[in-house]
Amino acid sequence: MKRKSRFWPILLGFTVLVAAGLYYVVRMFSVDLPDYPKVDKVTWLEQNWSQSQRGWMHHADQGTVTFSMPYEWLAALEQPTFTLTAGPPFLSSDYLDRFGFITADSSGLPVGFAHGGDLVDPKTAQPWVNPATGKPLTTVGLTCAACHTGRFTYKGTAVMVDGGPALTDLGKFRKASGLALFFTRYAPFRFDRFATAVLGPQADEKARAVLKKQLDKVLAGGRIEVDLDKKVAEKSIEEGFGRLDALNRIGNQVFSLDLERPENYVAQSAPVAFPHIWDTSWFDWVQYNASIMQPMVRNAGEALGVRAFINLTKSEQPLFASTVKVDTIFEIEQQLAGKQPTAENGFTGLRPPRWPSNLFGSIDTKLATEGAAVYADRCQGCHLPPVGSEGFWEQKHWTNENSAGERYLRVPIINVENIGTDPAQAQSMAERKVKLPSELGIDTDSFGSALGALVAKTAARWYDNQTPPVPAEQREIMNGNRQNGIQAPLAYKARPLDGIWATPPFLHNGSVPTIDALLSPAGERPKTFWLGNREYDPDKLGYLTDELKGGFKFDTAKPGNSNAGHEFSDTPGPGVIGPALKPDEKAALIAYLKTL
């Protein structure tokens, strides 16, 4: 009896010790998130999509497995908080909202989350199965809408913008999901709850042991990535709300993690603001640095970067086999693009939102008319005549028709030395090299060209694997009737400004919070400000920038974060594109931009 009576105090002491250690871990690695006030009303601005089109786009499955786990695991996770009893679910709408994810109207997942079919590893051609039932588990990952759906709040109303830049913090979300998995494995009693939710209450110890091994494998993969991040941390820049070093992250995922080559991993040194995507299907070049021509390469590359599974290393299975859903990606692009734009019909896919006068106040039409003249004098040379104007449709602004009868908008490409904005994103793509095995059949070490070739091979593998294989003519259509053009100029493109009022923060790296600040000399722009606030300022055209607990303090003095360039100033210098705007000119131009 004495031995038995001593057992429980020892067990209790051990449990307290483990709990204390985990509490320290939680305190050390906790994710600090903003608290947002509840809104009274939600409104989606009209942008030429039906409710069903919008709902489909919000959850279209590209084949991504962003969180390196099946849906059934994600649904069973608890939030990474310290508790011995059952914690709140990780997929709680209120919790995900704090990262910036928008609650969907009709789905249990937020906007931008896609729940797909069976999760099959292309390296083995085997499904990921529930060890208790033997049934395949299913995919879950991010889709386009996660990064390209905007939101503002204004006096208690949430205003949603399809195709606008999201205000999410994917870095915080990645950290939180990793901690949630860690706690699931090591926090007392949490694995038991997880196993019951995933396997069912009748699962035996053998099935639970297999599940634990699966979890250990995922955690080991996460540790590899954490270790790689530590090695490049000195050169990495925090992305924060509304930004991502997208191209470098895609490269790291494909050429380092998927290819199992740690030497190809680089710092996230060139974060960019999530771009708005209306009109872009009809640009001759896309990405901020005008680096990619073909829609399929752009979009399938994004899917790989958001962690679609791909086989680049196992010769037992076809190389370039992946979970990427090329057919869905084609449908996404079709819905964004619509038909060939014309002077009569304009853009017929996703359109920019109109200024919501009922919420933000009416536009001063007299002032806007004056602003049109300012735009013609100061902006039109780079950003083209206003969309919808007669001048916009002049042939000189468009390519000649291709064999499919399509033509594309020639977006002006401005050298970094002339525009004067932060060069990091353009330099990063131009200078990055990758080391590749000969088995891939890619004969370049240039990051951009290698990525273009790899994505094209991935799409081709999908076409070949269909029954029957997709014919050449249909492949051309699905690829967007454009060649796989890749370039890496030390330059940025100047796109049309329709809907620009709905796309803060500004400049490619998100370093200027409002249009009002952007139209001011660089020395008058905020040197530091907070990102993560959702409240919109209809006078300055941007988010409020007050200090926000759990938000992101943007420091323009850090590499990659410069707010210089694109400057109207009476002092000549790099990046000065015109004389300073007088206060009445600035007010008029702001009024005019609201009309676009």
Curated annotation (Swiss-Prot):
Membrane-topology annotation of the record: Single-pass membrane protein
Cellular component per GO, a single term: membrane
The keyword Ribonucleoprotein is assigned to this record: no
UniProt xrefs under InterPro entries: Cyt_c-like_dom_sf, CytoC_perox, Cytochrome_c_Peroxidase/MauG
Keywords attached to this entry: Membrane, Plasmid, Transmembrane, Transmembrane helix
Residues annotated as transmembrane: 7-26
Highest taxon of the lineage: Bacteria
Predominant location: membrane
Pfam families cross-referenced by the UniProt entry: RoxA-like_Cyt-c (PF21419)
One MF annotation (Gene Ontology) recorded for this entry: electron transfer activity
Subcellular location: Membrane
PANTHER family per UniProt: BLR7738 PROTEIN, CYTOCHROME C PEROXIDASE-RELATED
Annotated protein name in UniProt: Uncharacterized protein y4iJ
Source organism: Sinorhizobium fredii (strain NBRC 101917 / NGR234)
